[in-house]
């Protein structure tokens, strides 16, 4: 079954051009199937780009999936057209009484701020608490993962002396975990962050399990033992060119930035990005959707 998205969502045309099976709401209505309901709290500035990246990761699912896009009501996005937000997004007050099979909380480029300095922090705390009783499993990405670990377990982020930036090799720590089923022992994930999570702090929380780590990029994949919370410190959803765009952006701002590690390959026309992560990224999202969401969610929420 395909992902089920609004007929006018910009991502629809992009995904269809990539041969990813999508279905609009009108067609999905005629299928006598209970779709999975996933809410995406999109905290990234370029919301349309992030929507497309996440929907691409979930687009090969055999399950029919319906998406609700969420933004904080206490923050006004500056990089997404107002019309798009009004047409496709909602706020927490309109969904707080609903139950969802899964939730994705994206990253946000606000690592330099303390959590309490973030304009929507109190609202995010409320959403995180709500997710424990209204969502089967929540996937937190990058800053969203750090914020979730801080809120739920009191684990603080640690400022790095140098930005972790590039595509890094990771190894599986728990080979029998459902979330990494089908993975090779080593796989790649893009990272782009100035802060990290300390492994000793994670080990001190008995309710958490570390599923993969990198010698260079640190801890990557963490899950709660009840599988209701997943924390991903990298960006497996990134497009091939995303790190390149971030690198060129920072150069244009005259920032000190090294080229992303293990990312560019010299070709006849100069250095070009190489995508080493897409297959495992898709598998990770599929495993989360199948094992942590579909296999665990009730057919009828009470």
Curated annotation (Swiss-Prot):
Entry's transmembrane regions: none
Family assignment from sequence similarity: Belongs to the MetA family.
Site positions for Important for substrate specificity: 192
Binding site for substrate: 163, 192, 249
Active site: 142 (acyl-thioester intermediate), 235 (proton acceptor), 237
One Gene Ontology cellular component annotation held by this UniProt entry: cytoplasm
Organism: Bacillus licheniformis (strain ATCC 14580 / DSM 13 / JCM 2505 / CCUG 7422 / NBRC 12200 / NCIMB 9375 / NCTC 10341 / NRRL NRS-1264 / Gibson 46)
Annotated function: Transfers an acetyl group from acetyl-CoA to L-homoserine, forming acetyl-L-homoserine.
Protein name (Swiss-Prot/TrEMBL): Homoserine O-acetyltransferase
InterPro entries associated with the record: Class_I_gatase-like, HST_MetA, MetA_family
Site (Important for acyl-CoA specificity): 111
């Amino acid at each position: 079954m395909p992902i089920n998205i609004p007929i006018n969502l910009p991502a629809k045309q992009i995904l269809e051009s990539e041969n990813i099976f999508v279905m609009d709401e009108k067609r999905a209505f005629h299928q006598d199937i209970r779709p999975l309901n996933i809410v995406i709290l999109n905290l990234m500035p370029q919301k349309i780009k992030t929507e497309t990246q996440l929907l691409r990761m979930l687009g090969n699912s055999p399950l029919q999936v319906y998406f609700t896009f969420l933004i904080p009501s206490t923050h006004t996005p500056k990089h997404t057209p107002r019309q798009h937000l009004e047409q496709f997004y909602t706020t927490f007050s309109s969904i707080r009484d609903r139950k969802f099979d899964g939730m994705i909380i994206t990253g946000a480029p606000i690592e330099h701020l303390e959590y309490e300095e973030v304009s929507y922090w109190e609202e995010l705390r409320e959403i995180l608490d709500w997710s424990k009783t209204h969502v089967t499993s929540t996937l937190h990405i990058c800053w969203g993962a750090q914020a979730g670990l801080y809120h739920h377990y009191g684990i603080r982020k640690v400022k790095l002396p140098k930005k972790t930036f590039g595509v890094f090799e990771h190894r599986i720590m728990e080979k029998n975990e459902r979330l990494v089923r089908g993975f090779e022992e080593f796989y790649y994930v893009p990272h782009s962050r100035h802060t990290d999570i300390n492994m000793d702090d994670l080990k001190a929380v008995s309710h958490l399990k570390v599923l993969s780590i990198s010698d260079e990029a640190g801890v990557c994949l963490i899950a709660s033992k009840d599988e209701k919370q997943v924390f991903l410190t990298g960006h497996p959803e990134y497009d091939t060119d995303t790190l390149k765009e971030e690198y060129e952006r920072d150069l244009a701002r005259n920032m000190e930035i090294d080229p992303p590690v293990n990312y560019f390959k010299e070709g006849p026309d100069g250095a070009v990005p190489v995508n080493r992560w897409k297959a495992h990224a898709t598998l990770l999202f599929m495993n989360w959707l199948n094992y942590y969401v579909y296999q665990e969610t009730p057919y009828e929420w009470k």
